[in-house]
Amino acid sequence: MALQLSREQGITLRGSAEIVAEFFSFGINSILYQRGIYPSETFTRVQKYGLTLLVTTDLELIKYLNNVVEQLKDWLYKCSVQKLVVVISNIESGEVLERWQFDIECDKTAKDDSAPREKSQKAIQDEIRSVIRQITATVTFLPLLEVSCSFDLLIYTDKDLVVPEKWEESGPQFITNSEEVRLRSFTTTIHKVNSMVAYKIPVND
């Protein structure tokens, strides 16, 4: 019985993949809300990580994000994803205005039958809460997006990975004349996520 309990408390490869994929689901929703990419009335409040977070009620967006998160979970489990990037662009000109980059490190020695890593869910959630709080706080320094914007998700994977048909190849979509701000990181001991946001420096007329 004691052995079973310790397995439940530890972090397994599959459990780690689920934790990180879930973070991206809430993190992307937070970015889309904070940056006004979708109307605020299309979001609803939920409790997660000891915070009140906003998630979309837009059915098309829910479907899209669910598909992305499920695919991401699989790639995280296989340790074959290197980074996820949320790109925010001016709808009219296509110019990239913000680039939220999450670098993902994976301990490839972790296997299904490996002993669970000793880190509590609470410790991981505390770290994730700090990252989400920082995403929320970025509105205090990021330039106001005064034009209509859209977003793209870029996922960098190992070169030999088979990618689903609906996914398209993309360039890195970097920003010209940008500032970068590093955000906090979190780790499950199997996956580590480092966060940063780059934004276009406003030009004074």
UniProtKB/Swiss-Prot annotation:
InterPro entries: HORMA_dom, HORMA_dom_sf, Mad2-like
Protein name as catalogued: Mitotic spindle assembly checkpoint protein MAD2A
Effect on the protein of changing residue 133 to A: Prevents aggregation and promotes formation of monomeric protein that slowly interconverts between the open and closed conformation
Modified-residue entries (Phosphoserine), positions: 6, 130, 170, 178, 185, 195
Cross-referenced Pfam families: HORMA
Record-stated family: Belongs to the MAD2 family.
PTM description: Phosphorylated on multiple serine residues. The level of phosphorylation varies during the cell cycle and is highest during mitosis. Phosphorylation abolishes interaction with MAD1L1 and reduces interaction with CDC20. Phosphorylated by NEK2.
Source species: Homo sapiens (Human)
Domain HORMA span(s) in chain numbering: 14-197
GO biological process: cell division; establishment of centrosome localization; establishment of mitotic spindle orientation; mitotic sister chromatid segregation; mitotic spindle assembly checkpoint signaling; negative regulation of mitotic cell cycle; negative regulation of protein catabolic process; negative regulation of ubiquitin protein ligase activity
Effect of residue 195 to D: Binds to the N and C-terminus of MAD1L1. Abolishes interaction with MAD1L1 and reduces interaction with CDC20
Keywords of this entry: Acetylation, Cell cycle, Cell division, Centromere, Chromosome, Cytoplasm, Cytoskeleton, Kinetochore, Mitosis, Nucleus, Phosphoprotein
Taxonomic superkingdom: Eukaryota
Effect of residue 75 to A: Prevents interaction with CDC20 and leads to formation of the closed conformation
